[in-house]
Amino acid sequence: MRAVIYRENGPSSVLRLVGRPTPEPEPGEVRVQVHTSGVNPTDWKARSATPLSSPEQVPNHDGSGVIDAVGPGVDPDRIGERVWLWEAARQRLGGTAAEYLSCRRGTP
């Protein structure tokens, strides 16, 4: 899959489009094919100044998409459900600036 990442703080010029493995949902998680990734002030402020907690970060907290896979313990009838994502990058390495995102129901 494709994802936007940054490896250092700075303006939008630090963003890079890269290839990454498509995430597989873990127990209790769903995988969302992201259709829309929203950018809000929290996203660009974090990219500009917040110390990185890992070597690279996929930005953006908000988005929407469709569940395309479920992990163990999740009803497979959820596949095809349209969902809204919020705080997807909060305390995680992966935000919504990617083609796919795995998250727990009700929490990213």
What are the residue ranges of the model-derived segments?
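Glycine-rich beta-strand-centered segment in the early N-terminal region that forms part
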Residues: 21-38, 47-89
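Conserved catalytic-core motifs of eukaryotic protein kinase domains, centered on the activation segment
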Residues: 44-46, 96
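Conserved hydrophobic "DFG−1" position in protein kinase catalytic cores
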Residues: 5, 22, 46, 102-103
